[in-house]
Amino acid sequence: MAESDGKEKIKWTTTIIISSSLKSYEVAAALENRSHKVRYSDSVENGSIIFSLSGVAFLLMDARECFMSAEETFLAKIEKFINIHQNSFLVLFAALHGPEEWKLMFRIQQRFLGSNLRILPVHNTVNAINLMCTIAKITSKSYIDSICYRMITTKAYIIEQSPVWKTLQKIKLSSDTFNPN
């Protein structure tokens, strides 16, 4: 635990289900190194990472592999994935997101327009891990509760302390005295 601005930061860890096809990949090792409980499964879609407590799932695909395979093959894989997972993200790896990669993303977006799929273009493993962990963290129940509490506290502070709010209340009170209704 590290201290910052007088507050303790608690290290966030969760259980992650990873496709067995990713066992030898850098992504799996990086998630294990972050002290997450990693479980491998043959029953999930190849290339998928599921943060079960957060309810989010990520499908990892390399842009080069998409270019080399038939379009219907990888589109069918994506469709199967989004039909299974309600909160789904496609993590599209490319060292450089040039015109071809952007066209690929556009085709995928067109195909799945109106679905629950979101596309995350990433350049490397560190980028992918940071995005996945951030999304999973902010969608976990404990963080949602914490964010809601902070928003309620901030709202209460603004109402109690804001000179603008006080002025608006005075205006409202003075306008009520003139209103015959």
Curated annotation (Swiss-Prot):
Keyword Transcription regulation: no
InterPro entries: SCRE (IPR027857)
GO (cellular component) term, any one: chromosome
Source taxon at top rank: Eukaryota
Keyword Cytoplasm included in the entry's annotation: no
Assigned keywords, A-Z: Chromosome, Meiosis
Quaternary organization: Homooligomer. Interacts with SHOC1, SYCP1 and SYCE3.
Function: Plays a key role in reinforcing the integrity of the central element of the synaptonemal complex (SC) thereby stabilizing SC, ensuring progression of meiotic prophase I in male and female germ cells. Promotes homologous recombination and crossing-over in meiotic prophase I via its association with SHOC1. Required for the localization of TEX11 and MSH4 to recombination intermediates.
Name the record gives this protein: Protein SPO16 homolog
